[in-house]
Swiss-Prot record:
Subcellular location: Cytoplasm
Catalytic activity as recorded in UniProt: Cleavage of an N-acetyl or N-formyl amino acid from the N-terminus of a polypeptide
InterPro entries: 6-blade_b-propeller_TolB-like, AARE_N, AB_hydrolase_fold, Pept_S9_AS, Peptidase_S9_cat
Keywords: Acetylation, Cytoplasm, Hydrolase, Phosphoprotein
Active site, UniProt feature: 587 (charge relay system), 675 (charge relay system), 707 (charge relay system)
GO molecular function: identical protein binding; omega peptidase activity; serine-type endopeptidase activity
Protein name per its UniProtKB record: Acylamino-acid-releasing enzyme
Its biological purpose: This enzyme catalyzes the hydrolysis of the N-terminal peptide bond of an N-acetylated peptide to generate an N-acetylated amino acid and a peptide with a free N-terminus. It preferentially cleaves off Ac-Ala, Ac-Met and Ac-Ser. Also, involved in the degradation of oxidized and glycated proteins.
Length: 732
């Protein structure tokens, strides 16, 4: 039997972390053009991009690796790597041209200070760099957006132009008392006159530019930019409505214009990261006349428009606006030539039996269409696993491509000419890279997957999914008969199960979910001898829209009781050590952790909370998501809303700060000083309240970290401190 790492051995825990943190994560994949060999065979290259933690450099490194896939048109004959991995430094975005003969790369270079960094747009062809444009020196716009909310890098169908999104060039500003430099080369008559630089606006040095919140702090006014590759000329497109911010753009059929998503930014911007409910619509701007046309319903929220291979139709995801941040979405289809919009897949109120429970992905892959432009492939959470699906856009029929396969979760990276590139993982298996052809309509369940990169299972981890039904007194009257699930990881064959401690992890959001995929922290804790319980309480995504809608107005109550019920059920059935149960959660998971130690103080011996929501009322005026505070408390949100005393009272009543007098569990707080989502003063408020009551508490403040605490230095330090906290308060 494999030896478990004991709680009393932090050095071994550090060594274990060093080993498991080397597991890389897939971030992107693209398929090269189809090549015919001299013998008539067909093959394609698969270019993959990965990220990996580097503890020596304390950063996430990026690298690429290529593979060859030989096929006969509808099945893979042979597949394997074509060389070793190579680190890619400075690449922000890259995109193959439609023919596959060229590649565009957005690269940063220069100093480590942000003001010294320059951005270059490169065009590569075969074995040479064909063009390189210093975008920073050209001064047509500000920094290019490389994020997946607004950012894009799109080739025109003619492969002569590149489309991207950048920050609008800001006017120069100066003090009212700015001294002008004199031109010493001028004539005597000109000596007394100052030089004439670009006209600067006096007194605008400190004008506030509102940004898009968490992880988007430097992004305020995006503009659409077009680079003419031959001439090097850059144009900032006119015609975009003044009240929207453009992004996720691509070329319209025939290169006649540009299609983009426009997000409303009036009267002010709300945080957009992790929020699919921001009011937005699909637009088309004509390049010849600059006329802009609205293509979708302007009262909703949309994202991920994707043009079909035949350039006739566009699919996109559509959500209700200013409601819960993430919900079940519609898949909509816009016909370019008839101008008709239809709903292909509608919102699913609740899952019936083993049927489809709805679409919950926040983005469609850039490549998601079948070769015949009839079907769309995507991944989505279905209860506590993530599967791949194909939907027929004509009939709306949905078929799972992976439900009949191994337990675990899938992610679609791309599909092109029906060749799919996907990732598969489980809680005990790091990500594997697989390829397979999309079968003909009606036979979608018969995909034959071939591994390009197979990961080794992590021994010593046993996992499963528990279905839980709330007791009658905890039913939601409006949304009755909802169940929920929890994923349980536990050490394989422990010497004495009654001595196994348990860490309970509720997820954040609250409208997100855990799926049966690889996660570093739960795997690490399980290897150290803990059972780990990941709870998808009612309100989680993947269980139908009714489950999501059951939670707003009931936070701090329904979700808390669901987690506690799951804990009690698992302790009763598995006989783990009930005296050694700990909580670990971030954001809304931290909110629940702090609630649980206040409402059920006898159950938990330690608590670790990362950037937790502590006081909804005090967070309302400082967060980038004030709508969250209103909606989750149970009130409608509008940009002009002013909470009254009743609203403030409800916010306090649903906050963990209410239960401070009952708390006796030792608490470790981990806060990111740059967190715009749940400002670190939330955790400070809890810290001071606990200190005043002599409850054991420790606070770690990471000065350069934001809400996710995902930087390598913060993540590694927070994990080791969590291990030490568990060792101290649970014992070995």
């Amino acid at each position: 039997m494999e030896r478990q790492v004991l709680l009393s051995e932090p050095q071994e825990a550090a060594a274990l972390y060093r080993g498991l943190s080397r597991q890389p994560s897939l971030s992107a994949a693209c398929l090269g053009p189809e090549v015919t060999t001299q013998y008539g065979g067909l093959y394609r290259t698969v270019h993959t991009e990965w990220t990996q933690r580097d503890l020596e450099r304390m950063e996430n490194i990026r690298f690429c690796r290529q593979y060859l896939v030989f096929h006969d048109g509808d099945s893979v004959v042979f597949a394997g790597p074509a060389g070793n991995s190579v680190e890619t430094r400075g690449e922000l975005l890259s995109r193959e041209s439609p023919s596959g003969t060229m590649k565009a790369v957005l690269r940063k270079a220069g100093g480590t200070v942000s003001g010294e960094e320059k951005q270059f747009l490169e065009v590569w062809e075969k074995n040479r760099k064909l063009k390189s444009f210093n975008l920073s020196a050209l001064e047509k716009h500000g920094p290019v957006y490389e994020d997946d909310c607004f950012g894009c890098l799109s080739w025109s169908h003619s492969e002569t132009h590149l489309l991207y999104v950048a920050e609008k060039k800001r006017p120069k500003a100066e003090s009212f008392f700015q001294t002008k430099a004199l031109d010493i080369s001028a004539s005597d008559d000109e000596m007394a006159r100052p030089k004439k630089p670009d006209q600067a606006i006096k007194g605008d040095q400190f004008v506030f530019y509102e940004d898009w919140g968490e992880t988007m702090v430097s992004k305020s006014i995006p503009v659409l930019c077009v680079l003419d590759i031959d001439s090097g000329n850059i144009s900032v497109l006119e015609g975009v409505p003044e009240n929207v911010s453009p992004g996720q753009a691509f070329w319209a059929p025939g290169d006649t214009g540009v299609v983009f998503v426009g997000w409303w930014h009036e009267p002010f911007r709300l945080g957009i990261r992790y929020c699919t409910n921001r009011r937005s619509a699909l637009y088309y701007v004509d390049l010849s006349g600059g006329k802009c046309e609205l293509l979708s319903d302007g009262s909703l929220a949309i994202c991920s428009p994707r043009l079909s291979p035949d350039q006739c139709r566009i699919v996109y995801l559509q959500y209700p606006c200013l409601a819960p941040h993430h919900q079940c979405s519609q898949l909509c289809l816009y016909d370019w030539y008839t101008k008709v919009t239809s709903v292909v897949v509608d919102i699913v109120p609740r899952q019936l039996g083993e049927s489809f429970s709805g679409i919950y992905c926040s983005l469609l892959p850039l490549g998601c269409w079948s070769a015949d432009s009839q079907r769309v492939v995507f991944d989505s959470a279905q209860r506590s696993r993530q599967d791949l699906f194909a939907v027929d856009t004509q009939t709306g029929s949905i078929t799972s491509l992976t439900a009949a396969g191994s337990a675990g979760s899938w992610k679609l990276l791309t599909i092109d000419k029906d060749l799919m590139v996907a990732q598969f993982s489980t809680p005990s298996l790091p990500p594997s890279l697989k390829v397979g052809f999309l079968p003909p309509p009606g036979k979608e369940q018969s995909v034959s997957w071939v591994s390009l990169e197979e990961a080794e299972p992590i021994p010593g981890i046993h996992w499963g999914v528990r279905v839980l039904h709330p007791p009658p007194d905890q039913e939601n009257v409006q949304y009755a008969d909802l169940d929920f699930e929890a994923i349980l990881l536990q050490p394989s064959n422990p010497p004495d199960k009654t001595q196994v401690p348990m860490v309970v992890m509720p997820h954040g959001g609250p409208h997100s979910s855990f799926v049966t995929a690889w996660m570093l922290f739960p795997a690490m804790l399980c290897k150290m001898g803990f059972a780990v319980l990941l709870v998808n309480y009612r309100g989680s995504t993947g269980f139908g829209q009714d489950s999501i809608l059951s939670l707003p107005g009931n936070v701090g109550h329904q979700d808390v009781k669901d987690v506690q019920f799951a804990v009690e059920q698992v302790l009763q059935e598995e006989h783990f050590d009930a005296r050694r149960v700990a909580l670990m959660g971030g954001s809304h998971g931290g909110f629940l952790s702090c609630h649980l130690i206040g409402q059920y103080p006898e159950t938990y011996s330690a608590c670790i909370a990362r950037n937790p929501v502590i006081n909804i009322a005090s967070m309302m005026g400082s967060t980038d998501i004030p709508d969250w505070c209103m909606v989750e408390t149970g009130f409608p949100y509008s940009n002009s809303c002013l909470p009254d005393l009743n609203v403030w009272e409800e916010m306090l009543d649903k906050s963990p700060i209410k239960y401070i007098p009952q708390v006796k569990t030792p608490v470790l707080l981990m806060l990111g000083q740059e967190d715009r989502r749940v400002p670190f003063k939330q955790g400070m408020e809890y810290y001071r309240a606990l200190k005043a009551r002599n409850v054991p508490v420790r606070l770690l403040l990471y000065p350069k970290s934001n809400h996710a605490l995902s930087e390598v230095e913060a993540e590694s330090d927070s994990f080791m401190n969590a291990v030490l906290w568990l060792h101290t308060h649970l014992g070995s």
